[in-house]
A protein has these predicted regions:
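Extreme N-terminal starter segment of soluble prokaryotic enzymes
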Residues: 1-3
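Conserved N-proximal alpha/beta basic substrate-recognition cap immediately N-terminal to
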Residues: 7-119
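Short, well-ordered alpha-helical microsegments
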Residues: 12-14, 129-130, 182
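Flexible loop residues that form catalytic
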Residues: 65, 125, 146
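Rossmann-like NAD(P)H-binding beta-loop-alpha module
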Residues: 113-139
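Glycine-rich phosphate-binding loop of ATP-grasp-fold ATP-dependent ligases
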Residues: 119-122, 140-163
Length: 182
């Protein structure tokens, strides 16, 4: 059996499901926030009330993990770690998600590997926010929440908009050099 962790049955989930069915493989789509784990000598995952032995899982594909509290997010990642610790192959595993979901960590990894990115400055000190903006950016900079994707919460800070949406940023200010399209 293969598990597909997803928040919705989008095109990617449908394509994966069809591919598994083409090879006569059993597949279950799972909302990770509806999964539970049993940690004992007979460790299992519980999906929609059904206990599944980890020995019966051939692999798991992660297509989405919802936001939530720190505890909820950590638990969702713990489920993926749990599967891998029990020799279940997880595609788009917890380590990959941890490296890519946090813009600060991603920026640090890119920098450590000499992959060029726009100049970036991060602070949780509100006093440093405007100082950083005025010191390091001539005209405009991009202010982003450290979690999120697809441009959600992104703001251009410039002479006309000097204050970001503070509530959206949760007290961490990720400022990045604004690069014009060529």
């Amino acid at each position: 059996m293969y598990l597909i962790f997803t928040e919705d049955d989008g095109w990617h989930t449908n394509q994966l499901t069809k591919a598994f069915e083409l090879y006569n493989k059993e597949v279950a789509t799972v909302k990770i926030n509806e999964a539970s784990i049993v940690v004992n000598e007979n460790s299992k995952i519980i999906v929609e009330g059904k206990q599944i032995s980890l020995k019966d899982i051939d692999g798991a594909f992660v297509r989405g993990i919802p936001g939530g509290t720190l505890e909820e997010i950590c638990f969702h990642l713990d489920i993926l770690h749990f599967l891998e610790l029990h020799k279940v192959k997880v595609y788009n595993n917890a380590v990959c998600i941890e490296k890519s979901v946090d813009k600060v960590r991603t920026s640090c990894i890119l920098n450590a590997n000499n992959i060029p990115t726009p100049n970036t400055y991060i602070t949780s000190n509100i006093k440093d926010l405007m100082h950083l903006k005025s010191k390091f950016f001539d005209e405009s900079c991009v202010c982003k929440p450290i979690f999120g994707s697809q441009g959600k919460g992104l703001e251009i800070l410039n002479k006309n908009n000097i204050h970001p949406d503070y509530e959206n940023l949760n007290n961490v200010y990720y400022l990045q050099e604004f690069l014009e399209h060529p």
